[in-house]
UniProtKB/Swiss-Prot annotation:
GO terms for molecular function: rRNA binding; structural constituent of ribosome; tRNA binding. Signal peptide: none annotated. Part of the 30S ribosomal subunit. Contacts proteins S8 and S17. May interact with IF1 in the 30S initiation complex. NCBIfam families: rpsL_bact. Belongs to the universal ribosomal protein uS12 family. PANTHER family: 30S RIBOSOMAL PROTEIN S12 FAMILY MEMBER. Residues 104-123 are annotated as: Disordered. The keyword Metal-binding does not apply. This is Small ribosomal subunit protein uS12.
Length: 123
């Protein structure tokens, strides 16, 4: 516990909260170019081949982003939009690619939760 004199000499410093999505720089979404599209395996109790992409953003930062939904059309040099939102079982993946914008197609034959996957209303 500091004395009054110590507090006068040097005031208390507020603890800074760590940002969950630093690469977005307080923007809701950001545009970027895919540098590598690949699959990776999740952490321990789960087993799958999760689709992810390395994305170089317009601000120069390179991040790993998850590609949600079944099937995708992304490849190297695809222009994508990313949003915040981590994938719990993939360490280091803190961003999601927005489906149905720029070069990313929406999910085919999606009937429920369509707005999250950029799918048009079925006829």
């Amino acid at each position: 516990m500091p004395t009054i004199n110590q507090l006068i000499r040097k005031e208390r410093k507020a603890v800074l909260k760590r940002k969950k999505t630093p690469a977005l720089q307080a923007c809701p979404q950001r545009r970027g170019v895919c540098t590598r599209v690949y699959t990776t395996t999740p952490k321990k109790p789960n087993s799958a081949l999760r689709k992810v992409a390395r994305v170089r953003l317009t601000n120069g930062i390179e991040v790993t982003a998850y590609i949600p939904g079944e099937g995708h059309n992304l490849q190297e040099h695809s222009v994508v939009m990313i949003r915040g939102g981590r994938v719990k079982d993939l360490p280091g993946v803190r961003y999601h690619i927005v489906r149905g914008t720029l070069d990313t197609a929406g999910v085919q034959d999606r009937r429920q939760g369509r707005s999250k996957y950029g799918a048009k209303r079925p006829k």
